[in-house]
Amino acid sequence: MARIAGVDLPREKRVEIALTYIFGIGLSRSKQILRDTGVDPNKRVKDLTDDEVAKIRDYIDKNFKVEGELRAEIARNIKRLIDIRCYRGLRHLRGLPVRGQRTRTNARTRKGPRKTVGVMRKKS
C-alpha cells in the first residue's frame, strides 16, 4: 500500500485519482505532479514501483504544503484575521458568511439549524 504525506492511497484506484485523497491536492495538481515526475496517470496504485512512490512522495514534500501543515496554515490565517479584528475576522468569529453572502435568509450552513423563538401570551 502506497503511503504519501501520511495518507494511505486506495490500491485499486488510478494514481491520478488516488492522489486527490491527500488534503491540498486536487485533480489538476495531481495531473501536474504525475507529469513532472514522469509517472503514468492511468496506472493503478497497486502497480506502482517503490521508486515511483518515492519520486511522487519527494516531489510533494518539496513543492507543496499538504495535510496537517496546510490545515495549520489555514487555521493560522483565520486566527490572524480574528486577532486584527478586521471585517473578515469578525465574520469568522461570529460564525457568519465571510464572502458577502446575504444573511437575512439562507446562510444556514454557517449559522447552523434554526433557533425557534417562542411568543409569550398574556393569560386572560
Swiss-Prot record:
SUPFAM superfamilies: S13-like H2TH domain. PROSITE patterns: RIBOSOMAL_S13_1 (PS00646), RIBOSOMAL_S13_2 (PS50159). InterPro entries: Rbsml_uS13_C (IPR027437), Ribosomal_uS13 (IPR001892), Ribosomal_uS13-like_H2TH (IPR010979), Ribosomal_uS13_bac-type (IPR019980), Ribosomal_uS13_CS (IPR018269). Keywords: Ribonucleoprotein, Ribosomal protein, RNA-binding, rRNA-binding, tRNA-binding. Gene3D superfamilies: 1.10.8.50, 30s ribosomal protein s13, domain 2. GO terms for cellular component: cytosol; small ribosomal subunit. Residues 101-124 have a biased composition (Basic residues). Residues 99-124 are annotated as: Disordered. One of its GO terms (biological process) is translation. GO terms for molecular function: rRNA binding; structural constituent of ribosome; tRNA binding. HAMAP family: Ribosomal_uS13 (MF_01315). Belongs to the universal ribosomal protein uS13 family. Located at the top of the head of the 30S subunit, it contacts several helices of the 16S rRNA. In the 70S ribosome it contacts the 23S rRNA (bridge B1a) and protein L5 of the 50S subunit (bridge B1b), connecting the 2 subunits; these bridges are implicated in subunit movement. Contacts the tRNAs in the A and P-sites. Part of the 30S ribosomal subunit. Forms a loose heterodimer with protein S19. Forms two bridges to the 50S subunit in the 70S ribosome. This is Small ribosomal subunit protein uS13.
